[in-house]
Structure formats: structure tokens, C-alpha cells
Design a protein with these regions (language model features):
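Short, glycine-/small-residue-rich phosphate/pyrophosphate-handling segment
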Residues: 96, 109-164
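Membrane-targeting and insertion segments and their boundary/processing signals
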Residues: 71-75, 129, 174-178
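Short aromatic-enriched loop/helix-cap "lid" or pocket-rim segments at secondary-structure transitions
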Residues: 47-50, 139-141, 174-179
Length: 215
């Protein structure tokens, strides 16, 4: 059993990365081999619209033809039993690096046939972990539900199984006194990080363990 987690946050030790690490720890508890990839360490770009992945007879049919730091990551994902993507929400969507990964990861496997099919070689577990500043009850107000549902639907279409995990109302700064952010109540944020974030981490751990047991 092999599990890969991909961190789309520029921060390697904060909310998104912490939840992803808990997923991998859960998988490791069941004997899985794991890997955590930090996208911001890589030099890559999104889809170049070359359509080599869609061209009849192309050596790259069903695969991204672009060669850069992301190429070996995409190749390794083909061999895993579970893939978990994670990103904070920036301006109402995932980070630019995560979006670029998703273009290169999902689009080549997506056929332009009727009906649409997946060229991914097998069915695996997949999930997306989101972290964000807003509270759960604000999801509809900010229009995030559409993003979450669309992403989960694409993951399910390509990989066969998909789910989402959310970290709401996260503690954003190490020291709120140094940042002009008076719309946030630092004490409430700190209380939630102490009381609720550990529950989110447990959910992530349980997800990883469940994936590793192939449940």
C-alpha cells in the first residue's frame, strides 16, 4: 500500500501540512508506505494547452507531455493506492500551485468522448483537504460549496473514489499582534485551534488509516 499526499500550501508546518501529515501517519499506522510532496519546492507550470494528451496516436496520449519537476510526481501518483491533495483557500479557491497541479494531473486522464471516461489505470482512494479562515456556516455565503463539489466530482471521475475534509476558521498567524487583522478575534481563533483543530487532525489520521486498510 502506497499513499501520496500533496501540500499545495507555501507553509510546510502549518494547518494544511499538519492535516496532510496526520493522514500519512494514519496510513503508516496500518503499514502503508507514504510520501509528502510540497508543491512550492517544485519548478513547474500548469497546463500549456498543447493537447498532446488528447491527440490520436500521440506517445503522450492520456499523459501530460510537459517535462519539468512535476513530471516524476505525476508518474509516481499512477503507482499509488491513495492520493490526498491539500490546499488553503486563497481568494475563494485553492492556491495557484495546487490549481496548476490539478490541471496537469486530472486533465490528461479526462477523455473528450461521449460519455466522458477516465484513462487512469486503476481505481484508488482520493481526497482533498481544505483549510480556510471562514466558519463552516459561511460556506454557502462565500460560494465555496461549488468549488468543493466540483473538485470532488473530478477526483471521483478520474480515480473512482473521492472525499473531502475541511479545516474551518483556522488560526492563520503565529503572532496576531504583528498583523493588521482586527476583523478576527485572536482569542477565539486560539481557542478553536486548541479545541477543534486536534479533532480535525484525528479525522485526517482516521482517513489515512481507512485508506490504508482499503476501506
Amino acid at each position: 500500500m502506497r499513499v501520496i499526499a500533496v501540500n499545495g500550501s507555501p507553509r510546510k508546518k502549518w494547518n494544511t501540512a499538519t492535516l496532510l501529515k496526520n493522514v500519512l501517519e494514519g496510513a503508516e499506522s496500518q503499514g502503508a508506505e507514504t510520501e509528502l510532496i510540497h508543491l512550492y519546492d517544485l519548478n513547474f507550470k500548469g497546463c500549456k494547452s498543447c493537447f498532446s494528451c488528447k491527440t490520436k496516436g500521440s506517445r503522450s496520449y492520456g499523459k501530460c507531455a510537459v517535462k519539468d519537476d512535476l513530471t516524476p510526481i505525476l508518474e509516481r501518483i499512477e503507482d499509488v493506492d491513495a492520493v490526498i491533495l491539500g490546499s488553503p483557500i486563497y481568494l475563494g479557491t485553492v492556491t495557484g500551485e495546487m490549481r496548476s497541479l490539478m490541471e496537469r494531473l486530472i486533465f490528461p486522464y479526462l477523455t473528450y468522448t461521449n460519455p466522458i471516461q477516465s484513462l487512469f489505470p486503476k481505481k484508488i482512494h482520493s481526497a482533498f483537504i481544505y483549510t480556510m479562515n471562514i466558519a463552516e456556516e459561511q460556506i454557502e455565503e462565500y460560494g465555496y460549496a461549488t468549488l468543493f463539489n466540483t473538485t470532488e466530482n473530478y477526483l471521483r471521475l478520474i480515480f473512482g473514489e473521492a472525499e473531502s475534509l475541511f479545516g474551518y476558521d483556522t488560526y492563520q498567524f503565529r503572532d496576531y499582534s504583528k498583523v493588521l487583522a482586527d476583523r478576527f478575534d485572536e482569542k477565539k481563533k486560539a481557542k478553536r485551534r486548541k479545541e477543534v483543530f486536534p479533532e480535525d487532525c484525528q479525522k485526517a489520521f482516521d482517513m489515512g488509516a481507512r485508506f490504508a486498510k482499503n476501506e
